[in-house]
Amino acid sequence: MFLWLAHFSNWLTGLNIFQYTTFRAVMAALTALAFSLMFGPWTIRRLTALKCGQAVRTDGPQTHLVKNGTPTMGGSLILTAITVSTLLWGNWANPYIWILLGVLLATGALGFYDDWRKVVYKDPNGVSAKFKMVWQSSVAVIAGLALFYLAANSANNILIVPFFKQIALPLGVVGFLVLSYLTIVGTSNAVNLTDGLDGLAAFPVVLVAAGLAIFAYVSGHYQFSQYLQLPYVAGANEVAIFCTAMCGACLGFLWFNAYPAQVFMGDVGALALGAALGTVAVIVRQEFVLVIMGGLFVVEAVSVMLQVGWYKKTKKRIFLMAPIHHHYEQKGWKETQVVVRFWIITIVLVLIGLSTLKIR
């Protein structure tokens, strides 16, 4: 919204700063951060008053039983902060902004309904897996179709392999949709599985979103993208504003979600943030880079799939408990140790992902 102020730069030279993506990206992060910090206490009080307490699973780590009753659905604060900040600092004429907000709010609505069922019916399992998959699939397919037909040229419909500049595989509409589906739905569920300890998901989301913001900014500038041999995606630079808004909103939320957590983000936050990260990766054609930078999310999801699959086949477990962060808790790691060590791993992975900008 503030972008329109740049049109009056002839009257007041200082207003010209609003046309710069970098300035608006920084301001989007600060706005979302301030929003989360300002409305965080009110959100916690409101969720507590509405008795939106988390029903802790009895088959989980026994140390988590003390968390029973902690307000959940705090992700609604994150989503509101991202939406407000993006609308204030983003370019409303950019279709990617609306696709990202649509994915964020649509999957957020699913998460909200899931959390609401858990709160009202005291059912830790929430909505059925089938219902959740149908909803997520619908959002992913619609977003994938929109992004495919927005592509300006065939370079926007290729599969980029990190570290190899000569490998770029054409996808076509079916391949593009399949890859978009796997990226959006997979990341949504992976982030949701990661959100099992205080602060475990929030900060890695900040790190990955920051990394993707750099890719978005570079991909949206023809000279930069050509120099780094990345596909040029016209308008992708505005996606960086959405990403930095996500960073600010999650950092502000982390203030209240840090151990011992005053509030949990719930599915309303985790499902939406994961889907948004996946959509950004599809826009900038960096699905494999997302796998690298979001390696923590991948490992968490794979640990669950391996555990379930192996148990169904052999009636034995690979891990003491899944997702894998609970495995390390069962081995004697303190919750804070697991969280900080997983943060460190994510920092390293994001740096490796960023190295693909130049190492080819």
UniProtKB/Swiss-Prot annotation:
Catalytic activity: UDP-N-acetyl-alpha-D-muramoyl-L-alanyl-gamma-D-glutamyl-meso-2,6-diaminopimeloyl-D-alanyl-D-alanine + di-trans,octa-cis-undecaprenyl phosphate = di-trans,octa-cis-undecaprenyl diphospho-N-acetyl-alpha-D-muramoyl-L-alanyl-D-glutamyl-meso-2,6-diaminopimeloyl-D-alanyl-D-alanine + UMP
CC per GO annotation: plasma membrane
Keyword Nucleus on entry: no
Pathway note: Cell wall biogenesis; peptidoglycan biosynthesis
UniProt-listed Enzyme Commission number(s): 2.7.8.13
Topology versus the membrane: Multi-pass membrane protein
Origin superkingdom: Bacteria
Compartments in which it is found: Cell inner membrane
Transmembrane segments: 24-44, 69-89, 92-112, 133-153, 158-178, 199-219, 239-259, 263-283, 288-308, 337-357
Enzyme class per UniProt: transferase
Reported cofactor(s): Mg(2+)
A single GO molecular function term of this UniProt record: metal ion binding
Keywords, alphabetical: Cell cycle, Cell division, Cell inner membrane, Cell membrane, Cell shape, Cell wall biogenesis/degradation, Magnesium, Membrane, Metal-binding, Peptidoglycan synthesis, Transferase, Transmembrane, Transmembrane helix
GO biological process: cell division; cell wall organization; peptidoglycan biosynthetic process; regulation of cell shape
Main location: membrane
Similarity comment text for this entry: Belongs to the glycosyltransferase 4 family. MraY subfamily.
Protein purpose: Catalyzes the initial step of the lipid cycle reactions in the biosynthesis of the cell wall peptidoglycan: transfers peptidoglycan precursor phospho-MurNAc-pentapeptide from UDP-MurNAc-pentapeptide onto the lipid carrier undecaprenyl phosphate, yielding undecaprenyl-pyrophosphoryl-MurNAc-pentapeptide, known as lipid I.
Full protein name: Phospho-N-acetylmuramoyl-pentapeptide-transferase
Species per Swiss-Prot/TrEMBL record: Neisseria gonorrhoeae (strain ATCC 700825 / FA 1090)
